């Protein structure tokens, strides 16, 4: 296979002598090859296009300048002169390959095995012998990575070392495929790392990439994507490739695609300067000036040509360029070049015409008045603008790297020998490669020049930003804002942006979540998320997690943490406590007045007729009902909670037991009187008291058993007022009584109340002589209404934020109202008569015979029901 390839290359070398003639030749003992993009890529089938003044001519002249200096240095390669064969690649890899075949012609002919003897001319004339081609020992170039790759595949077959001054594709670091390739510029893998560091330093996490088709653009983007994936925190929205031969409207489509992900404002661009310029033009046409945030590779660097007349679109662009310096010696050399002293450069005349916008010779036809004739006296830098091209330093360093390697090789193989010794004729490429990889010297800019095992130079970059000057983009320029050498040093404060000059614009898939929000990641896109509020009682633990606060805590207003839930209770000063306390105080005062009046007039007919014993029991129950209000408002504690359990139902039980006993006695007397004159049993005062206290004892025994089974204590209930809005949440300090326990505590007395009401209904037909039957009935009816109203109010506020206040107030007011009804209907009228109408407090005449005969006489010693 190798023999077949060599035969093919030999044939191509023989077929391309004409094209190879367009070159710069310098005679020398050792010849270096050079590849430079003197012309741009041609259009419409042409191999070469317009002259490239800076990238082509400047770089080619830099090699000539370096060779002059090496040959003039008596300490470097003494007695050995370096020659050169410099070729134009026309910025096209296939054309460069054809040109590079001239570098291997001598080697191919050396392997020709007597092919020349087989050449016969017509008539037996011997063939003309052409001058033998130079034996190229090393090659400087090429510029574009695609060209270097194409040429490297050929040079390695003939063991010719190659050093590039501008090719940065990571692919060229593969020493198994490009083992004879080296470069004095760092590979794009370093550049890609620097660009990833820049993106991260700016806080961007969502960017798109844009690459020119070819090794440089595609390899650079691939390296950026891989490094960003390994580093994490940066996602690629889109990776767009610009075709090698873009069609009309292609760049408008590129901008349209970039706008499909408008949040990815950061655009990582690995493209040639022509593509960069057309991307900027399409951006302006789409009226998107200021939207995209460009991060350009070294192909953009600090060049003015891509941004000329497009400065407003380029403002804010961050670009990267291998660390370099302007070489003053080259400036002096180049600005003194003229048509007279630079005849060795066959393209210099074309450069002269292009640079000074003139013509050296007039055409045979009608002359163009707009183009003047060159005088030859023009001066570079005086009659035309001049700025040293950015890769000049690296061209000089590449030449010196080969020179230093040859010098070391000469010292090792030809010690004490001036000129070339037989050991270096011919020069072995593999041995030279070893010396090239071992060189270490200070280059033209004073920075160290060296190579690693893959032939790569260390990564050292300057970081630029294109900034407006005094608010004018057209007068702006590139400013150094940082450096990168294994680590990024970026002066963020020196950056300027459109809009707010000092605020870094975002390039993020999703905006940062606010306080109290967590990131809900989008599946498959680690840099995109939705912000989800930590609502309710949840708080933000970290950027991805919400958790519920402990039960005794509630979230802070911004849901970034938890804080203790306030504890509340019904206090003496609370507005909710005022109405029940007022009713209780008035009720106690009224009850005390009634009791005092009854005691003072204990033997008067009205007091005796009301049933003194049960009246005092009933009044005691009413007093206890009013007193419960103070227990319900008091601060909960073990003693208060125990007292609440005991007295909450005791007062009502005592009252309703007494009323039930009374109504039952009246009903039994009335029913018994219908059948006989014999009085019913258990209607004496003692019997009535025994029945009342027996009924009450059931409540007391039940409460005592409850106290023993579940000792009372206070609790803080955080669920009672755990409202939807955490800001309204409260912990309620209360006794350990649930709503059902409270109803259970009152349930027995309510049962007595219902039973009493039933007897009151049954006794509604009792004759007027039993003057308490109807008041008791009205009392029970009203009490039932009060408690029926209590139930929906009490349980209907279970979810209210004011539950503790409403329920306590409702309960105490209901108790006080029921007590007031009993007091008002049964005893206030009697007290009024006793105090204000004593003349009515006398025993009336005996009942009529008819009435008396139908009602059993009370037992001896009992209080009687006197007629009105």
From Swiss-Prot:
The protein's matches in SUPFAM superfamilies, at most eight in alphabetical order, are given as:
Periplasmic binding protein-like I
The signal sequence is 1-20
PROSITE patterns attached to this UniProt entry = G_PROTEIN_RECEP_F3_1, G_PROTEIN_RECEP_F3_2, G_PROTEIN_RECEP_F3_3, G_PROTEIN_RECEP_F3_4
- Cysteine pairs bridged by disulfides in the record: 48-90, 235-527, 358-374, 414-421, 509-528, 513-531, 534-546, 549-562
Annotated compartments: Cell membrane; Endoplasmic reticulum membrane; Golgi apparatus membrane; Cell projection, Dendrite
What's a single GO BP term from this record?
detection of light stimulus involved in visual perception
Task: Give the record's family classification.
Answer: Belongs to the G-protein coupled receptor 3 family.
Protein name in UniProt = Metabotropic glutamate receptor 6
Whose protein is this, by species? Oryctolagus cuniculus (Rabbit)
């Amino acid at each position: 296979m190798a023999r077949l390839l060599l035969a093919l290359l030999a044939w191509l070398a023989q077929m391309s002598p004409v094209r190879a003639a367009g070159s710069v030749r310098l005679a020398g003992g050792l010849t270096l090859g050079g590849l430079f993009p003197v012309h741009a890529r041609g259009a419409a089938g042409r191999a070469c296009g317009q002259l490239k003044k800076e990238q082509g001519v400047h770089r080619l002249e830099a090699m000539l300048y370096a060779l002059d200096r090496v040959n003039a240095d008596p300490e470097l390669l003494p007695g050995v002169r370096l020659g050169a064969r410099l070729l134009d690649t026309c910025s096209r890899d296939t054309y460069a390959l054809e040109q590079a075949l001239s570098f291997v012609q001598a080697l191919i002919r050396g392997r020709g095995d007597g092919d020349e003897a087989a050449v016969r001319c017509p008539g037996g004339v011997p063939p003309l012998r052409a001058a033998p081609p130079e034996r190229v020992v090393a090659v400087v170039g090429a510029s574009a990575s695609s060209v270097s790759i194409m040429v490297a595949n050929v040079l390695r077959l003939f063991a010719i070392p190659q050093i590039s001054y501008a090719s940065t594709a990571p692919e060229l670091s593969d020493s198994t495929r490009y083992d004879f390739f080296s470069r004095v510029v760092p590979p794009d893998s370093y550049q890609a790392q620097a660009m990833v560091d820049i993106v991260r330093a700016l806080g961007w996490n969502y960017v798109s990439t844009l690459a020119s088709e070819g090794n440089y653009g595609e390899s650079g983007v691939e390296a950026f994507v891989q490094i960003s994936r390994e580093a994490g925190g940066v996602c690629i929205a889109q990776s767009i490739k610009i075709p090698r031969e873009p069609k009309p409207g292609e760049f408008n489509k590129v901008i349209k695609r970039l706008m499909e992900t408008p949040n990815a404002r950061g655009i990582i661009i690995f493209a040639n300067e022509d593509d960069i310029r057309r991307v900027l033009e399409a951006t302006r046409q789409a009226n998107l000036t200021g939207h995209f945030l460009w991060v350009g590779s070294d192909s953009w660097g600090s060049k003015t040509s891509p941004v000329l007349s497009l400065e407003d679109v380029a403002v804010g662009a961050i670009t990267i360029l291998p660390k370099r310096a302007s070489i003053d010696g080259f400036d002096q050399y180049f600005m003194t070049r003229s048509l007279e002293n630079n005849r060795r450069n066959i393209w210099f005349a074309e450069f002269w015409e292009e640079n000074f916008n003139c013509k050296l010779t007039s055409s045979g036809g009608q002359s163009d008045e707009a183009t003047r004739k060159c005088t030859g006296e023009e001066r570079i830098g005086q009659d035309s603008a001049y700025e040293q091209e950015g890769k000049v330093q690296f061209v000089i360093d590449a030449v010196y790297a080969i020179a230093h390697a040859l010098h070391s090789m000469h010292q090792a193989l030809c010690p004490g020998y001036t000129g070339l010794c037989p050991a270096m004729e011919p020069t072995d490429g593999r041995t030279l490669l070893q010396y090239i990889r071992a060189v270490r010297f200070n280059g033209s800019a004073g920075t160290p020049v060296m190579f690693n095992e893959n032939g790569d130079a260390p990564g050292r970059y300057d970081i630029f930003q294109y900034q407006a000057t005094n608010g004018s983009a057209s007068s702006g320029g590139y400013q150094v804002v940082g450096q990168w050498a294994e680590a990024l040093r970026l002066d963020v404060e020196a950056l300027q942006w459109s809009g707010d000059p000092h605020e870094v614009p975002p390039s993020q898939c999703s905006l940062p979540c606010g306080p109290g929000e967590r990131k809900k990641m989008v599946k498959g896109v680690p840099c995109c998320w939705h912000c989800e509020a930590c609502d309710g009682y949840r708080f933000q633990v970290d950027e991805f997690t919400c958790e519920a606060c402990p039960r005794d805590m509630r979230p802070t207003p911004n849901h970034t943490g938890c804080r203790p839930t306030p504890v509340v209770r019904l206090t003496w000063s609370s507005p909710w406590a005022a109405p029940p306390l007022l009713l209780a105080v008035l009720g106690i005062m009224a009850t005390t007045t009634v009791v005092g009046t009854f005691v003072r007039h204990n033997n008067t007919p009205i007091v005796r007729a009301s049933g003194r014993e049960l009246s005092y029991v009933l009044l005691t129950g009413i007093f206890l009902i009013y007193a419960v209000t103070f227990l319900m408002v008091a601060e909960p504690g073990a003693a208060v909670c125990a007292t609440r359990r005991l007295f909450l139902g005791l007062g009502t039980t005592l009252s309703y037991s007494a009323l039930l006993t009374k109504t039952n006695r009246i009903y039994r007397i009335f029913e018994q009187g219908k059948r006989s004159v014999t009085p019913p049993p258990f209607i004496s005062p003692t019997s009535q008291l025994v029945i009342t206290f027996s009924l009450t004892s059931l409540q007391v025994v039940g409460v005592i058993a409850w106290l023993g089974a579940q000792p009372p204590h206070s609790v803080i209930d955080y669920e009672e007022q755990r409202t939807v809005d955490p800001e309204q949440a409260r912990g309620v300090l209360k006794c350990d009584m649930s709503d059902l326990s409270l109803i259970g505590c009152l349930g027995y007395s309510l049962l007595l109340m219902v039973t009493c009401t039933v007897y009151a209904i049954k006794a509604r037909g009792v004759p007027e002589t039993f003057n308490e039957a109807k008041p008791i009935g009205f009392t029970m009816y009203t009490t039932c209404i009060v408690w029926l109203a209590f139930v929906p109010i009490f349980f209907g506020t279970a979810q209210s934020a004011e539950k503790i206040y409403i329920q306590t107030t409702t309960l105490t007011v209901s108790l006080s109202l029921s007590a007031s009804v009993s007091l008002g209907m049964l005893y206030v009228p009697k007290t009024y008569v006793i105090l204000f109408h004593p003349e009515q407090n006398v025993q009336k005449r005996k009942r009529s015979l008819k009435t008396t005969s139908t009602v059993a006489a009370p037992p001896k010693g009992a209080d009687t029901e006197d007629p009105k």
